[in-house]
UniProtKB/Swiss-Prot annotation:
GO terms for cellular component: membrane. SUPFAM superfamilies: Fibronectin type III. The gene is LRRN4CL. It is a single-pass type I membrane protein. It comes from Bos taurus. Residues 1-22 form the signal peptide. Glycans are attached at residue 127. This is LRRN4 C-terminal-like protein.
Length: 232
């Protein structure tokens, strides 16, 4: 059967071009697989990690794209942070406060401290990477309420203070920005108190003894009657 002139011409051109190989269907499939992008993974971001690099910087610095947690609008004040562990050092009169970042854009944090029913004391501001801070100058035996506040260009998060709900709840961890803080008395203070109580008891005992002897000297002691001898 005679071949078509066009087909013969195509075969001739293919054989004349050096390095030309016929296309194989498997090669096309391999090229398509190589160009398929890998699925994105979550960024190494922890809301509670101290000195945590912002997630947007992790996206730019990483070799591959990663996913950041969703955030609220930057045009709104941030959601309240979540207060974490509070470690008290009674000997030093200080406490270390830990918190977790909210799912909101944050520029800075600070702590508010209430003692009794007085006005809150505002601590220094910390940048958005900080998740841990110290409270100093706490009184031994004092009771406080501490709140974490987050702020951005649109405003600051709400800090209910001593009137917050769930401060005294024992059902589970505190999920709000505030918590109660109690500083136990120092060991030396307890020792001094014990010595004071012991001294007071000793003084009271001595006073009772002196009073007893004074009464004996004043009224005299009752004399016992001599025993009567019966018979010779």
């Amino acid at each position: 059967m005679p071949h078509s002139p066009c087909l013969l011409w195509l075969l001739a051109v293919t054989s004349l071009v050096p390095g030309t190989q016929p296309l194989v269907a498997g090669d096309l499939e391999g090229d398509e697989l190589d160009e398929t992008p890998l699925p994105a993974v979550p960024c190494d971001y922890d809301h509670c990690r101290h000195l945590q690099v912002p997630c947007q910087e992790l996206q730019r610095a990483g070799p591959a794209a990663c996913l950041c947690p969703g955030l609220s609008s930057a045009l709104q004040p941030p959601h309240p942070p979540r207060l974490g562990e509070v470690r008290v050092e009674a000997d030093m009169g200080r406490a270390e406060v830990h918190w977790c970042a909210p799912s909101s854009p944050v520029n800075q944090y600070w702590l508010l401290l209430w003692e009794g029913g007085g006005a809150p004391q505002k601590g220094p501001s910390f940048n958005s990477t900080v998740r841990r801070a110290e409270l100093k100058g706490l009184n031994p035996g004092g009771a406080y309420v501490v709140c974490v506040v987050a702020a951005n260009d649109a405003g600051e998060s709400r800090a209910p203070g001593p009137g917050a709900e769930g401060l005294d709840s024992a059902d589970g961890p505190n999920l709000g920005p505030c918590g109660r803080l109690t500083v136990p008395p120092r060991p030396l203070t307890l020792l001094h108190a014990a010595m004071g109580v012991g001294s007071a008891l000793a003084l009271l005992s001595c006073s009772a003894l002196v009073w007893h002897f004074c009464l004996r000297q004043r009224w005299g002691c009752p004399r016992r009657g001599r025993p009567s001898h019966a018979g010779l």
